[in-house]
């Protein structure tokens, strides 16, 4: 063990700092156990009381009651399976759909090998991983939103529709000036 330097209490700069309260805890009692052992149970019991109170005062059903004699028109999975459901619904070949679903984790596992950087580096300085993550998030949101729509609107999310049976009068006015 090395020798530790003892503070020189005759130093006027150190004495001035100590006189102002610098160098030690001067703002009251410690947080543990005095404060936290009181606040933690109060917060936990308050949360439980609010949950029970809201459940008693305003009971709500979890979805619609089941009716075994009426099958819904389209059976949808839980919300977190919407992107997978959309892949299986839109791809005509089911084997291709399963392969597309298997390619998601396989592609995610290859990203660290594409980019040879330090794992503790700033994520915005890892452009391949950042781009793959952003594109994957956008595609998952697009597939998830599309799964909740009818099949004919699912790929375009209902934003772009063209019906050849409808006469578009605004376009005919536009083309008359050309």
From Swiss-Prot:
It is found in: Plastid, Chloroplast thylakoid membrane. Keywords: Chloroplast, Electron transport, Membrane, Photosynthesis, Plastid, Thylakoid, Transmembrane, Transmembrane helix, Transport. InterPro entries: Cyt_b/b6_C (IPR005798), Cyt_b/b6_C_sf (IPR036150), Cyt_b6/f_cplx_suIV (IPR005870), Cytochrome_b_C_euk/bac (IPR048260). Its main location: plastid. One of its GO terms (molecular function) is oxidoreductase activity. The chain crosses the membrane at residues 36-56, 95-115, 131-151. GO terms for cellular component: chloroplast thylakoid membrane. GO terms for biological process: photosynthetic electron transport chain. It is a multi-pass membrane protein. The 4 large subunits of the cytochrome b6-f complex are cytochrome b6, subunit IV (17 kDa polypeptide, petD), cytochrome f and the Rieske protein, while the 4 small subunits are petG, petL, petM and petN. The complex functions as a dimer. Component of the cytochrome b6-f complex, which mediates electron transfer between photosystem II (PSII) and photosystem I (PSI), cyclic electron flow around PSI, and state transitions. Belongs to the cytochrome b family. PetD subfamily. This is Cytochrome b6-f complex subunit 4. It comes from Picea abies (Norway spruce). The gene is petD.
